[in-house]
């Protein structure tokens, strides 16, 4: 299994899980179909679906474009209802296992400022993947994890420092805190979950102004003793159940 990152920021989020067979599951619809085609050598024949967490543009802007190109888009009904185009749509219900090609996907509801899912994704090659973004916190323990794609949007210390220095305002600070996961919260989530079987942790959706990629990577590595990556456009990561 390979994880290919096409975008991981407020400019657009999109990730490809590519199995050894070539079968591809898209996560998030925040990148244009043109870029999807370029990433897959203009061959969409093995794309089985796109799963999307919520309706905000950096995650869902191009959903209709995907559908128009024959890609089924799967999400919660609240998210799918936000666009007019209804062809190639599939409603995902929370805490129900959905088989999508070689993948099995289960959604869990998380805390954001609109209806939002995180996903548990199972595949024989990758094992159990957690994909979690745009959530204030994760009030769950997930047994049997093998790989994590986890939001680490901001540092509380950096955010508070910028507020003190007049670089941001209370309204923005409060919106960030109420809708995104901090480094401190991500660390708390990792502490209470069993990471014995985890190979890789990919930190996603880092804020341009309120994060520090090198610091975040070091802190999570020191906490977990796992391979930690900071998501960047164009990055390819081996995403297997076994480390080698």
Model-based region annotation:
Residues 1-40, 117-133, 146-147, 156:
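Conserved beta-strand hairpin/beta-sheet module of binuclear metal-dependent hydrolase folds
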């Amino acid at each position: 299994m390979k994880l290919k990152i096409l975008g991981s920021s407020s400019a657009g989020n999109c990730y490809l899980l590519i199995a050894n067979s070539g079968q591809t599951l898209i996560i998030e619809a925040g990148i244009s179909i043109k870029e999807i085609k370029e990433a897959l050598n203009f061959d969409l024949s093995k794309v089985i679906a796109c799963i999307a967490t919520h309706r905000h543009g950096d995650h869902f802007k191009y959903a209709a474009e995907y559908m128009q190109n024959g890609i089924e888009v799967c999400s919660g009904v609240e998210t799918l209802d936000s666009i007019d185009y209804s062809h190639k749509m599939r409603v995902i219900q929370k805490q129900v296992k959905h088989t999508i090609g070689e993948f099995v996907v289960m959604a869990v509801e998380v805390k954001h400022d609109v209806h939002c899912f995180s996903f548990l994704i199972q595949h024989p090659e990758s094992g159990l993947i957690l994909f979690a973004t745009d959530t204030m916190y994760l009030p769950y323990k997930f047994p049997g994890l093998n790989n994590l794609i986890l939001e680490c949007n901001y540092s509380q210390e950096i955010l508070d420092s910028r507020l003190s220095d007049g670089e941001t305002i209370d309204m923005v600070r409060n919106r960030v805190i109420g809708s995104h996961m901090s480094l401190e919260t991500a660390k708390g989530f990792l502490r209470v979950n069993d990471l014995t079987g985890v190979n890789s942790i990919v930190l996603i959706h880092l804020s341009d102004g309120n994060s520090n990629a090198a610091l975040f990577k070091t802190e999570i590595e020191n906490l977990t003793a796992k391979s930690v990556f900071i998501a960047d456009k164009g990055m390819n990561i081996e995403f297997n159940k076994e480390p080698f």
